[in-house]
């Protein structure tokens, strides 16, 4: 091949790539964010202590993490049959989304603060957390997952705040967790699948996360103002606008019945969606709540485009909540009846919260799930 022909082909190739980038726009001229985007990742939300001084892994370290995860056996076999732990582990890993790659070798999705950690709780938030923990532990007393002693009299008390966790009680649906009630989806939502569609003045996002925890969002991008502060919802009130090629979504008006890492109605979320190439979209989110954290924090998650022909995101159906919750409440009423007739144990001595001893108010995660370390 002559040098002149090689240069001509190189220029044509560069021009074609540039043209492709320009074509990633809708027919009405906005950046095209549409498609199915995969956010599954092995990168945790917070940086684990063992890599506290290493924001980015080496290629060799990242490859080892991916190989170690790939080599872990799935939860396909039951253990300790007949125990509460066995019942709590009724699923194998096919029901749980687990990433297989460290997309950009970072050790945390959080990029600010630089230490990759969620900022400390405010004194007010710590008091809330302690109050909830004490209440939940009191309800576990005398069970396999709690301290010894007689069942606590706090079983007769309402929770200190609107309950979002699994209490060791089933007096009514409000005693069960938001996930059991099919209300688990909240914002921000990381480590998920997204179907994005656009029309003039609106962006729609279908979120698929875990088992029955998805939801649908419709975001106005028309310059409209937020709803009055008196109108609250689980997903908040979202309003979008464009800053160059970045879609910025401002979310306020969260319900006090929603929860994200202890933050409720005072949560303020700002999302940024930017398509950086044909197959990659950067999702950056800043979370602020002066009643929960001492400062705002920001996370960035790379999203990879998936084939529309080979993949589909369906509406999330939470059938467990539709059917299982009623059965759970009915079973508790039956257990109470048997106890009253001296034919069964006191239901308050049965652990229906932790699955056998793990404090649900103190869940921790590391590599393999975008949650708190």
What are these regions (language model features)?
Residues 2-8:
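Sec-dependent signal peptide recognition
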Residues 13-15:
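N-terminal signal peptide c-region/cleavage motif recognized by signal peptidases
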């Amino acid at each position: 091949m002559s040098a002149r022909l090689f240069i001509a082909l190189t220029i044509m190739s560069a021009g074609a790539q540039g043209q492709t980038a320009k074509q990633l726009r809708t027919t009405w001229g906005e950046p095209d964010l549409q498609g199915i985007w995969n956010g599954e990742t092995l990168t945790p939300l917070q940086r684990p202590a063992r890599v506290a001084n290493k924001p980015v892994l080496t290629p060799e370290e990242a490859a080892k993490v991916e190989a170690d995860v790939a080599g872990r056996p799935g939860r396909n076999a039951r253990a300790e049959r007949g125990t509460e732990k066995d019942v709590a582990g009724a699923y194998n890993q096919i029901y749980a989304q687990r990433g297989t790659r460290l997309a950009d070798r970072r050790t945390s999705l959080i990029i600010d603060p630089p230490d990759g950690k969620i900022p400390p709780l405010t004194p007010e938030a710590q008091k809330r957390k302690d109050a909830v923990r004490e209440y939940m532990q009191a309800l576990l007393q005398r069970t396999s997952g709690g301290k010894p002693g007689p069942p606590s009299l706090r079983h007769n008390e309402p929770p200190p705040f609107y309950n979002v966790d699994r209490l060791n009680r089933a007096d009514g649906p409000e005693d069960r967790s938001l996930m059991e009630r099919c209300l688990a989806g909240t914002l921000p939502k990381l480590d998920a699948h997204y179907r994005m569609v656009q029309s003039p003045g609106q962006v729609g996002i279908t979120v698929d996360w875990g088992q029955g925890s998805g939801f649908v969002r419709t975001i106005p991008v028309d310059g409209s103002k937020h709803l009055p502060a008196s109108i609250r919802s689980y997903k908040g009130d979202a309003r979008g606008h464009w800053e160059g090629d970045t879609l910025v979504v401002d979310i306020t008006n969260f319900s006090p019945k929603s929860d994200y890492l202890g933050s409720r109605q005072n949560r303020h979320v700002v999302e940024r969606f930017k398509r950086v190439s044909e197959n990659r979209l950067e999702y950056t989110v800043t979370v602020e709540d002066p009643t929960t954290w001492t400062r705002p924090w920001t996370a960035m998650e790379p999203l990879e485009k998936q084939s529309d022909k080979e993949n589909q995101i369906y509406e999330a159906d939470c059938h467990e909540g539709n059917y299982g919750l009623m059965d759970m409440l009915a079973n508790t009423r039956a257990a109470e009846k048997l106890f009253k007739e001296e034919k069964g144990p006191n239901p308050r001595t049965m652990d229906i919260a932790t699955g056998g001893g793990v404090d649900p108010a103190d869940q921790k995660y590391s590599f393999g799930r975008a949650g708190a370390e």
